[in-house]
UniProtKB/Swiss-Prot annotation:
GO molecular function, one term: antiporter activity
Record protein name field: UDP-galactose translocator
One Pfam family named in its UniProt record: Nuc_sug_transp
UniProt record, GO biological process: UDP-galactose transmembrane transport
Catalysed reactions, as listed in the record: UMP(out) + UDP-alpha-D-galactose(in) = UMP(in) + UDP-alpha-D-galactose(out); UDP-N-acetyl-alpha-D-galactosamine(in) + UMP(out) = UDP-N-acetyl-alpha-D-galactosamine(out) + UMP(in); UMP(out) + UDP-alpha-D-glucose(in) = UMP(in) + UDP-alpha-D-glucose(out); UMP(out) + UDP-N-acetyl-alpha-D-glucosamine(in) = UMP(in) + UDP-N-acetyl-alpha-D-glucosamine(out)
Complex and partners: Interacts with SLC35A3; the interaction is reduced in the presence of SLC35A4. Found in a complex with SLC35A3 and SLC35A4.
Localization terms from the record: Golgi apparatus membrane
Gene name linked to the record: Slc35a2
Function per UniProt: Transports uridine diphosphate galactose (UDP-galactose) from the cytosol into the Golgi apparatus. It functions as an antiporter that exchanges UDP-galactose for UMP. It is also able to exchange UDP-galactose for AMP and CMP, and to transport UDP-N-acetylgalactosamine (UDP-GalNAc) and other nucleotide sugars. As a provider of UDP-galactose to galactosyltransferases present in the Golgi apparatus, it is necessary for globotriaosylceramide/globoside (Gb3Cer) synthesis from lactosylceramide.
UniProt KW Membrane keyword: yes
Family affiliation: Belongs to the nucleotide-sugar transporter family. SLC35A subfamily.
Primary localisation category: Golgi
Topology of the protein relative to the lipid bilayer: Multi-pass membrane protein
Amino acid sequence: MAAVGVGGSTAAAGAGAVSSGALEPGSTTAAHRRLKYISLAVLVVQNASLILSIRYARTLPGDRFFATTAVVMAEVLKGLTCLLLLFAQKRGNVKHLVLFLHEAVLVQYVDTLKLAVPSLIYTLQNNLQYVAISNLPAATFQVTYQLKILTTALFSVLMLNRSLSRLQWASLLLLFTGVAIVQAQQAGGSGPRPLDQNPGAGLAAVVASCLSSGFAGVYFEKILKGSSGSVWLRNLQLGLFGTALGLVGLWWAEGTAVASQGFFFGYTPAVWGVVLNQAFGGLLVAVVVKYADNILKGFATSLSIVLSTVASIRLFGFHLDPLFALGAGLVIGAVYLYSLPRGAVKAIASASASGPCIHQQPPGQPPPPQLSSRGDLTTEPFLPKSVLVK
């Protein structure tokens, strides 16, 4: 969802979804506030709906579709969408678009080949998510999948030499504890379990997906920082590689079955909904996060966990016990704490230590950091790029 929400496309879109421009200071704050609330709603629905729709489609009675074909179709649709967006950027001039793609994809082939690595990982991640969601309850997957924040943070420290605040390290520990509690509840659950589900395989798939998501997101960020290509061009290149690699994976894993039963075997409206969500969800988030800050994205993740849990109870008969509630609560709190901007943390710590006071700036000293015109404090630079809320 990778889409890279949950998959490659989401992560890829998120990697390039850097807030670009703020509203003018004199513009109406009410309109911007509405956009932020709309952004929150879109992020919550996209995060929860992809997981729930995959779970629903994979547990429906009848012929089960091939997950590898869904991954390929999502990559094809994502690539076509990015191609149309680039076509619109060239004002509908086919010649200009062809010349641009020839220069960006073929002439600068080194930059193009660099995207083969994250594309391979995103394709693998998308397939792993189908395995995980097919073997775990949607709510359990949603909570456990937040380990991607931990892996992304660790890869950012190792590959980008980023530093984390003490609060962020503490929130990562809290996150790991919450996920461990949820998995302990899953392993010790006494309720009925479908015979075709393997929680151990589901957990292994989630962990592998989180590791791949963290590495690919940070690697993709490094590529974006070292080049001038637009996010739509990079997603088109990812889509080209993703389609090719997805077809190789399809042939390797399910080639004989697909050849005998057909590429679209088992496709229903629910399956097409999953494919469309995977293809367009990440691109939609890339546009939405222009109006979202880290706190909003962390809040969206927390709400999507709650929404997934409630929907799982209604749709799939998920049993909510105190142990799961405790673990999920720790994860929600950890996500929120991790997304807090450092400026806000320092301000809270300073206020609690010294109490309310009026601070006067000494002469000759630079002014303290101010709220931006968007109303947000300075945020962690890598979080909007590498951690995509799903």
